[in-house]
Swiss-Prot record:
Pathway: Porphyrin-containing compound metabolism; protoporphyrin-IX biosynthesis; 5-aminolevulinate from L-glutamyl-tRNA(Glu): step 2/2. Keywords: Cytoplasm, Isomerase, Porphyrin biosynthesis, Pyridoxal phosphate. GO terms for cellular component: cytoplasm. This is Glutamate-1-semialdehyde 2,1-aminomutase. One of its GO terms (molecular function) is transaminase activity. InterPro entries: 4pyrrol_synth_GluAld_NH2Trfase (IPR004639), Aminotrans_3 (IPR005814), Aminotrans_3_PPA_site (IPR049704), PyrdxlP-dep_Trfase (IPR015424), PyrdxlP-dep_Trfase_major (IPR015421), PyrdxlP-dep_Trfase_small (IPR015422).
């Protein structure tokens, strides 16, 4: 029994499922999760000190790689002055100004402690601003574990939502409408039916929780038009895509301006940070200046602000996103070529520093949740464990996006592709 197996056995006696977030349990791939004790650059090291090339990056935050010196220095320096005050600090202002500089649509913003808090608060704000109850989300898009968002489609696109988890009252979930991602016609149909009842659309501009599925041409533009037509709020959930698809997020990459934006992951540089913001007139509805309540003991925590500010400052220097995009393309296309050499049918998607691959015979681009669910999950499980044995750590679920960092050099990507070629040959 290795150290991870020992720790997992111990953890299950005190922590539900042995983990503090379900996907970490390896239920999607089987086997024992790797317990990590340290990380550096593009590598993580398990409890037995085995090294892995890391394409999870703490599920997205580590865009500069692990243990970046600028972030560590900022955290250590700030921590010497105190860990938390529960009062305003200057660094909160500096951080907010930096975010607005990079994401101009966020004219005003509020810091929180997680992406879930950000999306939950943005939806409450949209409801308060519009005076409407219903929200529209997309099948396969994840926006955190707030009750209103753990909802899947009922029987048909135009039916009311039903809960996707025990503990969510159906009477509450009925206010969440769900339609197919990348299908603007369904959006128009449901708005025609519910018209002035819908407070907002919330969308991952690049869907990252059904693997990696970019928007089809015209989809985001269509959402903007529908929201304008019906005076609903367009919320871009950029918790995953923010500062990763482009320096200004997916909204900069696709040149679409939402009314509200939610951020997380990269904005914290590895610390627990989220944010939501947008049009000044909407943000003026949030307490203490407006009637919509939102609060948080650790919101704007100085250590987290320091880490996030250092991360964004470093990320904005040079042409890092051009390098990230090139590296991601090299990896994704290299995986596809390696699969083809070994007679394995593989579809790949990538945008910015996000990538995904699907074991499928479908020759069409993967653009929908339905297509993603029809891919070969069993083959992914085998490939995942083969790659793990080769020292490559992929997301332990076929529905999760992969992430690159500036620490993923050409040599590291080439090493990954050599391992992949070997693993595809064994499928």
């Amino acid at each position: 029994m290795n150290k991870s197996e020992q720790l997992f056995e111990q953890a299950q006696k005190i922590i539900p499922g042995g983990v503090n977030s379900p996907v970490r349990a390896f239920n999607g791939v089987g086997g024992t999760p790797c317990f990590i004790k340290r990380a550096q650059g593009a590598y993580i090291y398990d409890a037995d000190d085995k090294a892995y090339i890391d394409y999870v990056g703490s599920w997205g935050p580590m865009i500069l790689g692990h243990n970046h010196p600028a972030i560590l220095e900022a955290v250590i320096t700030t921590a010497k002055n105190g860990l938390s005050f529960g009062a305003p600090t200057e660094i909160e202002i500096t951080m907010a100004e930096k975010v607005r500089e990079l994401v101009p649509s966020m004219e005003s913003l509020r810091m929180v402690s997680s992406g879930t808090e950000a999306t939950m608060s943005a939806i409450r704000l949209a409801r308060g601003y519009t005076g409407r109850d219903k929200i529209l989300k997309f099948e396969g898009c994840y926006h955190g574990h707030a009750d209103a968002l753990l909802v899947k489609a009922g029987s048909g696109a135009l039916t009311l939502g039903v809960p996707n988890s025990p503990g969510i009252p159906e009477d509450f979930a009925k206010h969440t409408l769900t339609v197919s991602y990348n299908n603007i016609d369904e959006v128009k149909e449901i708005f025609a039916k519910y018209a002035d009842e819908i407070a907002c659309i919330i969308v991952e501009p690049v869907a990252g929780n059904m693997n990696c599925i970019p928007p089809v041409e015209g989809f985001l533009e269509g959402l903007r038009d529908v929201c304008d037509q019906y005076s609903s709020v367009l919320i871009f959930d950029e918790v995953m895509t923010g500062f990763r698809v482009a320096l200004g997020g997916a909204q900069a990459h696709y040149n679409i301006k939402p009314d509200l934006t939610t951020l997380g992951k990269v904005i914290g540089g590895g610390m627990p940070v989220g944010a939501f913001g947008g049009k000044q007139e909407i943000m003026d509805y949030i307490a203490p200046v407006g009637p919509v309540y939102q609060a948080g003991t650790l919101s704007g925590n100085p250590i987290a602000m320091a880490a996030g500010l250092a991360s964004l400052t470093e990320l904005a220097q040079g042409n890092k996103h051009q390098q990230l995009s090139s590296a991601t393309e090299k990896l994704a296309m290299g995986l596809k070529a390696a699969a083809e050499r070994n007679g394995v049918s593989l579809s790949v998607n990538y945008v910015g520093a996000m990538f995904g691959f699907f074991f499928t015979e479908d020759k069409n681009p993967i653009t929908t949740y339905e297509q993603a669910t029809q891919c070969d999950g069993e083959m992914f499980k085998r490939f995942f464990h083969l790659m793990l044995d080769e020292g490559v750590y992929l997301a332990p679920s076929s529905y999760e996006t992969g992430f690159l960092s500036t620490s993923h050099t050409d040599d590291i990507i080439e090493k990954t592709l050599v391992a992949a070629d070997k693993c595809f040959a064994q499928l």
